[in-house]
Regions:
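Short loop/beta submotifs within extracellular cysteine-rich repeat domains
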Residues: 58-61, 71, 159
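Long, compositionally biased low-complexity segments
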Residues: 80, 91, 98-489
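Short Pro-Gly-centered flexible turn/kink motifs
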Residues: 83-93
């Protein structure tokens, strides 16, 4: 594993202004410059409905990027233009029985390339070697595009009354064809570069995973990163649009950024990083995640946990350099990049079952691991074991035996593989700070079936709950005594 000595040294040179600088952080209020949607799927006859809202009185240009779940390779990307107070919606659905995913929208907001009424098909070029990156070791078929996660990153604010602003602003004329921007056809990959400035915040997003036939409905909020950049992220030298690796701050080294996390009492801890993606990872770090489960057979209940590591590919994919890099310990090889963890499953009366790595883990001897960038952990039903939970995922690398019919679980992300941690951060005094755990987002999804409903009536009751989390660090005692991430997944 490569060391980060040079990165740490660069970060130490930049900490004198860290407290006052723009810094990337997870916004608990839900709006920001960059949005992360932890999961989309079209498996199991499901569709994923997505929306993004511009809450500000200024237009935005954003990169929308869909990444498959094995290794975080791109499957579809395009530029979205949001006028002031605009809302954009779309649906991800399955193209055919043996096909991949396809994006469909009837929304009038401008995109480049333009999304036709027939939809935009997800592509395998990001991982099969026919695109700009070499093929990876994951599945090469188009069905790999059916599950993954989504990024929407604002790359610039559109200058008011500029050519681009006029082109993308919806014209409300009171007619049936009203509300349509007049200049979508005039946009190109570069036409707007001179009409944008550094982006401000104000985006929020939602997603819903729907199975019409079963009547299931799993809705969640996108995670929002604020302070992602203080420069425009679209330019002649960066025409492909921003990714999570493009976080930056003018007070950090070129290519670097500052992250804000928070002490338990709410005081911010600013850490400078020489590489932008490390600051994003810092904002998302958790040493443990917490949530509930329910698998009561009398309720027909089932539970999945979505556990997504949205920056993982930058540390484990050989296309981005030699790896693996901490906080991850295993490169993406033979279709997996395992992350060893420890899980403690509690029933409602404090009884606990521990799943290793540990010396003695009675009564179940399982070493749990998350194999992919997007992971779906399924809680098995004690009466009828299952291999796929309510989300019907093909990315279920961990089946968790529950402790009773319902309760809570804690997944320790710091303990495995000899210890997961992110080094390279420096506080305002120049002291090195290492964050324990992994960068993670996700939620719990459950479904309950009412077997007493009238025949022919849909009787599924679904819900989602965002993961909660804690984070710890090694560094100055006053700063690292008890630390949590900004939003607390």
């Amino acid at each position: 594993m490569r060391t980060r000595t040079i990165r740490s040294a660069l970060a130490l040179l930049l900490v004198s202004t860290a407290n006052a600088a723009l810094a990337v952080s997870l916004n608990p209020k839900g709006t920001g410059q960059a949005l992360i949607y932890p999961y989309y799927t079209v498996n199991n006859s499901q569709d994923t409905l997505i929306s993004v809202v511009n809450t500000s009185a200024v237009g935005k240009v954003a990169e929308v990027r869909f990444l498959e779940g094995y290794n975080g390779r791109d499957t579809l990307a395009f530029t979205l233009f949001l006028s002031k107070f605009d809302v954009w919606t779309a649906a991800v659905t399955q193209a055919s029985d043996d096909g991949g995913a396809i994006l469909k929208t009837s929304d009038a907001s401008c995109t480049f390339p333009r999304i036709l009424t027939t939809g935009a098909s997800f592509l395998s070029t990001g991982y099969d070697g026919s695109g700009t990156l070499p093929a990876d070791s994951g599945p090469q078929t188009i069905t790999r595009t059916r599950e993954g996660f989504i990024e929407i990153i604002a790359g610039g604010d559109i200058v008011a009354d500029s050519t681009t602003d006029v082109a993308i602003t919806h014209v409300q004329n009171g007619n049936a064809g009203g509300g349509v921007p007049p200049g979508c056809a005039d946009l190109s990959a570069t036409s707007f570069f001179s009409d944008i400035v550094a982006p401000t915040g104000g985006l929020f997003g939602n997603a819903t995973i729907v199975n019409v036939g079963l009547g299931t409905f799993f809705g969640y909020n996108a995670e929002a990163l604020q302070g992602f950049t203080d420069t425009a992220l679209f330019s002649e030298s960066h025409a492909d649009g921003p990714t999570l690796a493009d976080a930056n701050s003018s007070d950090a080294a070129p290519g670097g950024a500052i992250a804000n996390i928070f002490n338990q009492d709410g005081r911010p801890l600013s850490l400078s990083y020489a590489i932008g993606v490390d600051a994003v990872s810092a904002a998302l770090m958790a040493d443990s995640i917490y949530n509930e489960y329910v698998v009561d057979p009398s309720l027909g209940a089932s539970t999945d946990w979505v556990v997504t590591f949205p920056t993982k590919h930058f540390y484990v994919d050989g296309a981005y350099g030699d790896g693996p890099l901490q906080p991850f310990a295993e490169s993406f090889t033979d279709g997996v990049s395992n992350v060893l963890v420890e899980a403690n499953i509690y029933d409602r009366e404090e009884g606990v079952v521990t799943l290793g790595p540990c010396t003695l883990c009675p009564p179940v001897d399982i070493t749990p691991a998350f194999a992919y960038e997007v992971n779906v952990a399924t809680f098995e039903n004690q009466i009828v074991p299952v291999t796929a939970g309510p989300l019907g995922s093909a990315l279920t690398s961990l089946l968790i035996p529950p402790n009773g019919t319902d309760g809570a679980a804690i997944v320790d992300l710091a303990i495995g593989d000899g210890g997961h941690s992110l080094s390279g951060g420096a506080d305002a005094s120049g002291s090195a700070v290492t964050l324990k755990g992994l960068p993670v987002v996700g939620f719990m999804a459950y479904n309950v079936i009412n077997t007493q409903a009238q025949p022919g009536m849909l009787a599924n009751y679904s819900g989602t709950y965002r993961h909660r989390s804690t984070m710890s660090c090694n560094g100055p005692a006053g700063e690292c005594a008890s630390v949590i991430t900004g939003g607390g997944q």
